[in-house]
Amino acid sequence: MDDVRLTFHAVAEPQPGPGWRARFERSWPAYRGWYLRDGDAARPSYADARRMLLAHMPELAPTWERLVELAGGGDLAARMLTLYDPPPVVRGCSQAVFARPEPVLVRNYDFDPDLLEGVICSSAHTGRRVIGMSDCLWGLLDGINDAGLAVSLAFGGRRETGPGFAVPLVVRYLLEICETTEQALGALARIPVQAAYNLTILDRAGAAVTARLSHDRPLSLAPAPVATNHQQHVEWPEHSTAIASVEREARLLDLLADPVATEPELVGAFLEPPLHSTAYAAGFGTLYTAVHRPAEGAVEYLWPGSRWRQSLDAFEEGSRTVRLPGAKRSKDCSHV
């Protein structure tokens, strides 16, 4: 395979403005195609989507209204930007919390390189400072806030879906309104989600959990703050086998149980198999590793041979191009 180069952009925009509008204009044709892939009738009406956002995440409504304005005020963009009941997306990912010497949340994001936004956003939409990796134009794949809360997502390994929100917006919501893991769990218990996902959460006090979400089951907690791409047990065997979900979980649990492993060793394991994946042609290659440090208000983004540190107090705008060894551009094969 040929190597692929990905460019990541770090953008500071406290409130959505010209920068977001430019990203929307570049991305909207692709997002429009995704949103309508099953036909317009498969998506909720404007009234229903708005009603659900106001009912379950009202604190985000002013930001959503601003985004709709920046996007031109159209019905379709407004509906999509609620991220209520969009087409489901299947991702990879491995994530865990380690507590040596300070608690850190480490994650690998595994997905198709053609479908990654690659934008590290520093924002303050609701007044709280947040750094995170953008997805779906204003959702987040993972991130940290100025209260010291860190959250990351991993697909939960079920085909079944139902009415609810895309989880990247839920991650955004938690980081905008919550300060502690306990508060985040309280919010998750009342927000409907579209598909099965695992959220690993860590706060500044060191409280760490992996919450198992689904559209048709109550919120539950994993025995340890680790997650790959299944929940209590494997329910989509073909998918789990193809992306080595069970093997990756076992590796994370071994690392968590190792009493002498240092933080560099723990983090380094995410850059090696089985946690690091080169299955780019299948849409599940590792695109970045993120080390969230709540005590420092910082996130480090890692790739083989490269590191980019960002913090709430010293955010560096700019771009970094990284090489993914053995990667190959692929067709979109990462939807349910």
Please report, for each region that a protein language model flagged, where it lies by residue.
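Short, glycine/charge-rich beta-strand/loop segments that flank catalytic centers
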Residues: 76-97
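C-terminal, well-structured catalytic/ligand-binding subdomain of enzymes
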Residues: 1-75, 83, 100-336
